[in-house]
Amino acid sequence: MLLKTINTLGLVAVVAAGAELLTGFSSPKDLVPATDGTAYGTPVVVGSGTVRSYVTYAGGEAVEVGVAMSEAVMQGLPAAGDHPEGHHDTHEFVLDMPDGNPTPFKHVGFNWNPGGHEPPGIYDQPHFDFHFYMIPEADRMAMVPADTADFNAKARSYPSPEFVPAGYVAPAPVAIPQMGVHWIDPKSPEFNGKAFTQTFIYGSWNGKLIFAEPMITKAMIESRQTVTTPIGSAERASLPGRYPTSYTIRWNERAAQYEVALSGLVTK
């Protein structure tokens, strides 16, 4: 979210775990279902459990793309002082996508924020950020202000209006390195006197929309409610594919996992 305090040279922590550590999931990377079912990306160790991306299919089409967290993830999460450099407010884990993924989302930045982040009084609750990126990871990692003028110019280059989701605005042309410019919905509850429990954000960079981001408190996820919330979407998309019209938070009892998903996918 806007105004995170991040050291761009020490942000990413990707865990390549051996099979013996991947508790809660059975296989490294599941195959794409022929018609219906769920395909998973490679599990990554987070806390005492594992996290991985997934795509769910129905009738041969992708209907949901999300992140699955095994139950044990909520135990042993790193604290602010556990970061390798000791002064960051976020821990990021990069998730690959399932093989054959038909959505425009190329990887997920899964962020745990033990003390929340700015702005104070709004997003300072312990929460998770789920960045579904529409650019390759290598391109995102290159988004650093080595050339300040060029970096700022790309931040100020907004998408054309038809590519901007309905109801969303960029409060300021300020880009977070290796993330982008964050766009908010001013009608969201947290901007209207209510406590933050969940919200949805989009991100842009260099004239294009590059990510979709549910942000959800740890307490909300652990409440095991099933909540589907409509979101604004753009008239057009720069990449063809399946795009969300809502996002869903749920506890999957059968799989014993928490799920946060971009749902109601439609073709653009």
Question: What are the residue ranges of the model-derived segments?
Answer:
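Metal-centered catalytic cores of metalloenzymes
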Residues: 26-130, 134-268
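Bacterial Sec-dependent signal peptides at the C-terminal "C-region" and cleavage site
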Residues: 17-29
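Bacterial N-terminal signal peptides that target proteins for export
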Residues: 1-10
